Amino acid sequence: MSARLGRAASLWLLLAAVAVAFADSSIVVLALPDLLRAYGSSIGGVSWVVTAYNLVLALASLALVWLARRLDERRSVRIGLALFLTASLACGLAWNLVSLVAFRSVQGLGGALLLVGSLPLVRRLATSPKRGVTLWIAAGVVGTAVGPAAGGLLTELLSWRAVFFAQAPLAAAALVVALRAHRGERPAPSERPSPGASSARCLSANIALALASAALVGVLFLAVVLLVNIWRFSPLTAAGIVSAIPLTTFLVQPLAVRVQSRSTAAAGVFALAAGLAGMAFLPARSILWVLASLALAGIGLGIVVPTLSHIALSGGGAGTAPGAWNVAARHLGLVAGLLIVTPLLTSGLSQQGERAKLQATSAILDAPLPVKTKLELAFSLAPVLARPASKGLPNFSDEIAQRHIGKATGLGEKLDSIVQAAFTRGFRRSYLATGLLGLLALVPFAFALPAGSRRSRRRALAAPALALLAAASLLSAETARGAFSYGSKPRLYAPCAARKPFPGHGADAASQRLALETLDQVACHYDKSREQLVVALAAKGADSKALRSLLEFGTVNWSALSKWLSKL
């Protein structure tokens, strides 16, 4: 009895270590804003904390494929856990970004040795080899899904260093188990890999798994960046929101294990792609829309990854090679997804940032504030708007409240709404790209999964039909709530076009009209709108004084402005 309990404890400790190694692919995402502040780096530099781990883990797993026949799984797990434990502690003590990236690379190497060697051990410790494969896959899916939420919770409650320190005790306990493990028997002939169709199915399943993993970048990384950097949620709140992914994954994963068919896997792909499309067409800054989209993506994750992993591992024998291929496929997919999405996101945010500056400047110039106040505000906020979105959007409500202006007009809330809507739309192409990567997984897994009988195929069409219905319902609801207009290109007046006069009566309204008409006259001379002129002057380092004096008197003093206007 005690031996059986010890065996079970060893199994669950090893599975927990496997889950942590998979979770590390995304566990630091919610800590990236803290790392940006701690090290004063760019988002490109800090992103290597994520990329280094996944890249080294994927490449090391590929190398271990060719060493599979010579690799002793017990030694692989022991060395892997020792490296993972040491690197986790070192990451928590990192003194700069370079050292953190270096230690994350070592952690990735340890993770590769652990994951590749753990599969044969789990097969032997479980009640049956088949159950061992199921548990190993489940640990990987759970770890991948829980990673962002767990990292966000630790970052908010303690610090980003706690994300790494928390992994050390578990790795140490698993290392003790691995050191006590005995050499198992050689696999029976029935467990050894079979050539031909089985190999082709394994290859197809791993290719499909890589594409699905690339799509997961949308829910594991993009969603977190949107919630923290653009919508300004705390890491703890963001962790609660993204927990919709593991919750729905847990619910559907048992179904995926029991029913492995093309139709079920297709339903998972459609659900994953639909969740990403839902994130691409968010109609408002609303947690409910994000939860609905992430829940749908979580359902897809819980179906696709276990189904494809079972096929990839079941036909490859009992050694370390099947696990190596599986781990490599998943993490190469993540790295490829990051490489594809990063330039799309950078471009989208840059483009929307320019639009947001013009639209916010227009709102400031049209606000019922004194000319002096609105110009000072427009020029002072221009550098803030020019700051990269990766460093987080400013809180305009607080900025304006500190200046004791615009409270009655709701200008701060209006600026927040304008800028957040614009930058949210900047994620659209990235989400659509990840959704397309997910749909491409349909091609290879058509060869990986059995088609079944004609009767079973007709009956099985219900699963993908249900997924498509859920996708259509979500996208239709978002469209009805204005998804296509949310954050769209602002309708600004063309240079020299006639504009509506400033509303109101009395001396103040007359002064406003005169000032804005003069501003339009100057802007027209340079073939710009008034918003483009103010943004351009602020970008050149001008202040509002010269422009304010010109507007207050209603005459164009070209010589006073020549210093700045000549640069336009």
PLM regions with names:
Residues 2-14, 27, 37, 62-76, ...:
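Surface-exposed, interaction-prone regions with an acidic/low-complexity signature
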Residues 2-10, 214, 372-468:
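Transmembrane-helix exit segments and adjacent C-terminal regions of multi-pass membrane proteins
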Residues 6-32, 40-65, 69-77, 81-87, ...:
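12-transmembrane solute porter fold
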Residues 54-187:
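Helix-loop-helix hairpins in multi-pass membrane proteins, especially solute transporters
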Residues 156-157, 282-283, 343-356, 450-452, ...:
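C-terminal region of N-terminal signal peptides and the immediate post-cleavage residues
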Residues 183-195, 228:
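Phenylalanine-glycine-rich, low-complexity intrinsically disordered regions
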Residues 269-271, 349-382, 522-525:
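Juxtamembrane non-transmembrane segments of integral membrane proteins
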